[in-house]
UniProtKB/Swiss-Prot annotation:
It comes from Streptococcus pneumoniae (strain ATCC 700669 / Spain 23F-1). The lineage of its organism: Bacteria, Bacillati, Bacillota, Bacilli, Lactobacillales. This is Galactose-6-phosphate isomerase subunit LacA. PANTHER family: GALACTOSE-6-PHOSPHATE ISOMERASE SUBUNIT LACA, RIBOSE-5-PHOSPHATE ISOMERASE B. Belongs to the LacAB/RpiB family. The keyword Cytoplasm does not apply.
Amino acid sequence: MSIVIGADAAGLRLKEVVKDFLEKENFHLVDVTAEGQDFVDVTLAVAAEVNKEEQNLGIVIDAYGAGSFMVATKIKGMVAAEVSDERSAYMTRGHNNSRMITMGAQLVGDELAKNIAKGFVNGKYDGGRHQIRVDMLNKMG
């Protein structure tokens, strides 16, 4: 499993914080950030890498998380969530089988961002009664 991470200019500093944290937790990271990328481009780049392997997960950081989230939801087969708290990050894996989260660097601080990332990458899909919803999401787009 790889954690694919990317950020636009507004999210660069926080991306480095999250990246360093996850690397210290021994996760394999792929950073697709390129200088001057808009949140649209970076979200598409993260999604492309995430979709290469079923186990891959993605994290995109921009100013507010909303722009990247809107892009991610336009990608066929991508289930994404905009999160700004640890519980939502964890639960979106468990209940929605989300493969990507977006965060806003102007909304969350360093420690919260690390905890959000940790909750997301450590979350496991629960299946069962949640599969009906996931099937509905996967039929869309």
